Amino acid sequence: MISLLKKLYFTFSRSSRIIITLVIIDQLTKWWFINNLRWKPGLMLKVTSVLNMVYTWNYGISFGLMREYYQYSNTIFLITNMIIVCYLYYLMICSKTIGSFAGYSFVIGGAIGNLIDRFCRGAVFDFIHFHYRNYSFPVFNLADCFITLGVIILMEDYFSTKKVIEETSKGNYDNLQIEVMAEKIRHTDHDSKI
């Protein structure tokens, strides 16, 4: 029982530091763009030939989907997102690898950053806009970048773990090689986590 409580404490404290750091970075960048540039919605600042900073509010979900249902759906978005964040936190606590731990931390940090916007401002503030010739990527923010990076980390972790499992089931390695490969992707002590 004590070891379980110790594991939960270390997981909570380390994950909380990562998540809180990501949320602070996201909220500070949004605060800076909202309060210091004081643009009118729709105006843009050209940074490079493919990157603009724009002042826009997203009343929908990802990429502005369902924004026309905003007046009915903001509460539903908030509740659904909070449930998803709680479930992802549970998965993170149960994670067996550093990669999955980091991936879930990034997804949760980004999700909480956008939840704060939706709760405090009624919409998510987006400001990064990539475009090239006739292609225009939907406007996004750092929280969206954190979520995307977290998903990429989770996918890489899944496939690298799957590869070790497949190789060991084929019998291509002796026990020492298996242990070395598994140790590279698996953590055995929460003290060694990020």
UniProtKB/Swiss-Prot annotation:
Membrane topology: Multi-pass membrane protein
Entry annotated with the keyword Mitochondrion: no
Record flagged with keyword Membrane: yes
Keyword terms, alphabetized: Aspartyl protease, Cell inner membrane, Cell membrane, Hydrolase, Membrane, Protease, Transmembrane, Transmembrane helix
Residues that span the membrane, as ranges: 75-95, 97-117, 135-155
One GO CC annotation: plasma membrane
Localization, UniProt: Cell inner membrane
Catalyzed reactions: Release of signal peptides from bacterial membrane prolipoproteins. Hydrolyzes -Xaa-Yaa-Zaa-|-(S,diacylglyceryl)Cys-, in which Xaa is hydrophobic (preferably Leu), and Yaa (Ala or Ser) and Zaa (Gly or Ala) have small, neutral side chains
Enzyme Commission number(s) from the entry: 3.4.23.36
InterPro entries: Peptidase_A8
List of catalytic residues: 126, 144
GO terms for biological process, alphabetical: proteolysis
GO molecular function: aspartic-type endopeptidase activity
Pathway in which the depicted protein is active: Protein modification; lipoprotein biosynthesis (signal peptide cleavage)
PANTHER family for the chain: LIPOPROTEIN SIGNAL PEPTIDASE
Annotated family: Belongs to the peptidase A8 family.
Described function: This protein specifically catalyzes the removal of signal peptides from prolipoproteins.
Protein name, per record: Lipoprotein signal peptidase
Source organism per UniProt: Rickettsia prowazekii (strain Madrid E)
